[in-house]
């Protein structure tokens, strides 16, 4: 462990200071500390120093410098989650400034597709919303048995998946909300289908039959009254001599008309027979 030239700290001590200042949130102080480091390539290539530089660049909004650091050095897997968050958040912020509005889930998805994680901070495994598929599989399996894990169980799941407890809690919360929304939609569709079926059942087939029968009955004279054609024939023959004889004959024929409505030929004979006889009498 040798001291750095013209500097009172060893490389390990510098790395420790960077980690402590990051964890304490003293990012401005961390930035001043990094600026005070001597120009030593070996020191500036230390992974803790590089990670500290990336954090400070993000904090100051210097995203171009952040991307350069993340793309130019191979980082250890245990640092990937933190650096991936910096990469994605920086691109989200730039996209929001460009569009002038916050990004939704779809907007963030498009940003991730447009700016994929560099292999220097990504092991190549497919991710979804920054969750590895293996981690999501563990959460899905747990959800099928218990959608409401306890705080202790959430901590255990976080350790098993490499996620934070907050990420685990948010995953279960979002999954429950999606399932409730799907169930509500299914109930709504079922109720709408039942309502439509009930309305159809309320329209009795007898109603339609009744209206058809009513219209049919209106086209015919009631059985107690003479047929309109017969009445007209009777009225026309009353003005001729011998009308009284015909009127009786016509009336008798009219009374039998309704019994023959189902037989058109019989109806025609019953009306024309008396009329022909009357015309013969009038002509003689």
UniProtKB/Swiss-Prot annotation:
Q: Where is this region: Disordered?
A: 167-238
Organism the protein comes from:
Danio rerio
Q: Which Pfam families match?
A: Homeobox_KN, SIX1_SD
Q: Where in the cell is it found?
A: Nucleus; Cytoplasm
Q: What is this protein called?
A: Homeobox protein six1b
Question: What PROSITE patterns would the database entry show?
Answer: HOMEOBOX_1 (PS00027), HOMEOBOX_2 (PS50071)
Q: SMART domains under this entry? A: HOX (SM00389)
For this record, the Gene Ontology CC terms, alphabetical, are: cytoplasm; nucleus; transcription regulator complex
Q: Which family does it belong to?
A: Belongs to the SIX/Sine oculis homeobox family.
Q: Where is the composition biased (Basic and acidic residues)?
A: 179-190
- Subunit comment: Interacts with eya1.
Which gene is this protein's source? six1b
Which spans does this entry mark as compositional bias, Polar residues? 191-204, 226-238
């Amino acid at each position: 462990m040798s001291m750095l030239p013209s500097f009172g700290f060893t490389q390990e001590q510098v790395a420790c200071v960077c980690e402590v200042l990051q964890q304490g949130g003293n990012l401005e102080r961390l930035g001043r500390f990094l600026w005070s480091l001597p120009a030593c390539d070996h020191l500036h290539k230390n992974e803790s120093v590089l990670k500290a530089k990336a954090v400070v660049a993000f904090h100051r909004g210097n995203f171009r410098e952040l991307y350069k650091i993340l793309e130019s050095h191979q980082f250890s897997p245990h640092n990937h989650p933190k650096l991936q968050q910096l990469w994605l958040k920086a691109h989200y912020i730039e996209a929001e400034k460009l569009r002038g509005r916050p990004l939704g889930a779809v907007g963030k998805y498009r940003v991730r597709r447009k700016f994929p994680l560099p292999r220097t901070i990504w092991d190549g495994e497919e991710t979804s919303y920054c969750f590895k598929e293996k981690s999501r599989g563990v959460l899905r399996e747990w959800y099928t048995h218990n959608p409401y894990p306890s705080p202790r169980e959430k901590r255990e799941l976080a350790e098993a998946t490499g996620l934070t407890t907050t990420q685990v809690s948010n995953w279960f919360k979002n999954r429950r909300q999606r399932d409730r929304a799907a169930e509500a939609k299914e109930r709504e569709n079922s109720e709408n289908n039942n309502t439509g079926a009930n309305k159809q059942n309320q329209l009795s087939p007898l109603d339609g039959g009744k209206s058809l029968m009513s219209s049919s009955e209106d086209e015919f004279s009631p059985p107690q009254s003479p047929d309109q054609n017969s009445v007209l024939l009777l009225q026309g023959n009353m003005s001729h001599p011998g009308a009284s004889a015909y009127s009786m004959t016509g009336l008798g024929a009219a009374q039998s008309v309704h019994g023959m409505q189902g037989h058109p030929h019989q109806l025609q004979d019953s009306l024309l027979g008396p009329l022909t006889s009357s015309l013969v009498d009038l002509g003689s």
